């Protein structure tokens, strides 16, 4: 969730924000910045380390600390220009010191920045350099694991996370490493369908973030991620509790605002959903937020405003024409979801799979293939998406629609029922479509049919039992 975009598009990101907020008239919806009254801690840190470097431009440690302040600002605001600045600061640091163990922290930070920029192989290389400089050091392991997970190398990712979790006890407390182990490992646990374990990891991470007095955004992100897990499992009240806690920790946090928009839509409170999404878009107009806002307008019977938002997503896509590394998957899914620019959707999904062989890239490819009439290939791609046993209603919905198009009604029913069993409100438009598709297959979506699908596993976090989809591969 933390991934942002490539550093080479940092200035483009600011251009998108300015053009979108100005051209589409949403800037006026943004509340006044709290920094006008209270100095922003990240800005203060940036100015402090800039001043230190002005006095001593050859002290490489100050470059590392400045990079950390820039990266934190990027996470807080969604403005990836700060990741570009962080990368530049780290490059200066490594020019001064790159071969001794003192350089390891810079390589660890560079791995984190490259992950945020979706440069996953470079992130893996950075982490490897850090580990080679200080064998046995734990700092690089979370990012080594993250890079492999993003590239779909799940067994290798697990090895790194296990090394982090099972580090030898040296008799000293390492609370920061414990937080990183809990929060990073939870993502892989979720992908592997271990939802109980993923939830426990994030719950522990939230407690540790509070105990460690981490920056407000770090706590807000952890609360947000826990809320995301609850939403995925259809536990709307718990999801709302965590997202509101995220907003208490960091007011105007765009991720939590968008999450609340999705929760309100699932609750049928569409006007409130629109308000939350509009606030998120005003802060940072990410395509996924704008598309979701359009979907809520469509669900509320306002096709004109929905189309306006959809055109805004296309506008963002045009501005990113030079380099679409970050938004490939989001744009591919948007085009496929709304039957727009379908050949382009397929091209974007294929391009994304070149660098990310993870389950979600396979899902995007499967959906784009279906919409382009390539049903056989879509079945192959959706099997790849389901291979880890990930509990995700949208994956199951896509699988159900693909098998319906292929004429395999038994599998279609199994996947559509599973989607609604996981979360009957998983999407403001597609959950109703899943129910209609089941009706067309002469199967009434009901509590009884969902509860009968209880073969293996658990939906976790107190959720209902789950069933492996018919014919689906859950091998790692």
Regions found by a protein language model. Name each.
Residues 65, 109, 143, 184, ...:
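Canonical tetratricopeptide repeat
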Residues 62, 103-106, 140, 174, ...:
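TPR alpha-solenoid repeat register
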Residues 25-105, 424-425, 431-450, 455-461, ...:
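N-terminal leader/linker segments that initiate helical-solenoid repeat arrays
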Residues 73, 77-80, 117, 151, ...:
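Structural motif corresponding to the intra-repeat A-B loop/turn of tetratricopeptide repeats
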Residues 59, 68, 75, 100-103, 112, 137, 146, 171, ...:
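Residue-level recognition of tetratricopeptide repeat
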Residues 50-58, 92-105, 166-176, 208-219, ...:
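Flexible helix-coil transition and linker loops at the boundaries of alpha-helical arrays
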């Amino acid at each position: 969730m933390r991934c942002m975009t490539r550093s080479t598009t940092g200035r483009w990101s600011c251009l998108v924000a300015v053009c979108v907020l100005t051209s589409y008239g949403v800037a006026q919806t943004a509340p006044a910045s709290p920094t006008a009254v209270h100095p922003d801690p990240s800005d203060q840190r940036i100015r402090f380390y800039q001043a230190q470097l002005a006095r001593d431009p050859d002290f490489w440690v100050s470059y590392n600390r400045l990079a950390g302040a820039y990266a934190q600002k990027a996470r807080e605001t969604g403005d990836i220009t700060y990741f570009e600045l962080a990368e530049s600061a780290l490059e200066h640091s490594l020019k001064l010191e790159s071969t001794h163990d003192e350089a390891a922290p810079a390589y660890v930070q560079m791995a984190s920045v490259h992950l945020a920029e979706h440069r996953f192989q470079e992130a893996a290389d950075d982490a490897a350099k850090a580990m080679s400089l200080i064998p046995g050091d734990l700092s690089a392991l979370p990012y080594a694991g993250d890079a492999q997970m993003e590239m779909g190398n799940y067994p290798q990712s697990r090895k790194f996370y296990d090394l982090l979790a099972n580090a030898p006890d040296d008799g000293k407390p390492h609370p920061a490493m414990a937080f990183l182990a809990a929060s990073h490992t939870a993502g892989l646990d979720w992908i592997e369908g271990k939802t109980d374990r993923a939830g426990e990891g994030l719950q522990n991470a939230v407690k540790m973030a509070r105990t460690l007095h981490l920056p407000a955004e770090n706590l807000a992100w952890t609360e947000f991620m826990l809320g995301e897990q609850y939403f995925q499992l259809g536990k709307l009240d718990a999801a709302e509790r965590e997202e509101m806690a995220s907003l208490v920790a960091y007011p105007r946090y765009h991720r939590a605002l968008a999450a609340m928009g999705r929760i309100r839509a699932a609750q049928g409170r569409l006007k409130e959903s629109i308000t939350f999404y509009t606030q998120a878009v005003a802060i940072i107009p990410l395509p996924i937020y704008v598309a979701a806002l359009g979907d809520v307008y469509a669900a509320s019977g306002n096709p004109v405003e929905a189309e306006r938002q959809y055109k805004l997503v296309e506008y963002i896509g045009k501005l990113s024409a030079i380099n679409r590394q970050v938004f490939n998957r989001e744009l591919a899914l948007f085009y496929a979801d709304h039957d727009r620019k379908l050949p382009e959707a397929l091209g974007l999904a294929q391009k994304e799979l070149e660098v990310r062989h993870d389950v979600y890239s396979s899902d995007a490819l499967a959906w784009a293939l279906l919409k382009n009439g390539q049903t056989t290939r879509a079945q192959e791609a959706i099997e790849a998406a389901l291979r880890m046993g990930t509990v995700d209603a949208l994956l199951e919905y896509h699988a159900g629609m693909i098998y319906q198009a292929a004429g395999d009604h038994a599998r279609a029913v199994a996947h559509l029922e599973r989607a609604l069993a996981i979360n009957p409100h998983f999407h403001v438009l597609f959950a109703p479509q899943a129910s209609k598709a089941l009706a067309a297959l002469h199967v009434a979506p009901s509590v009884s049919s969902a509860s009968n699908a209880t073969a293996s596993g658990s939906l976790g976090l107190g959720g209902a039992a789950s069933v492996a989809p018919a014919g689906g591969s859950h091998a790692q």
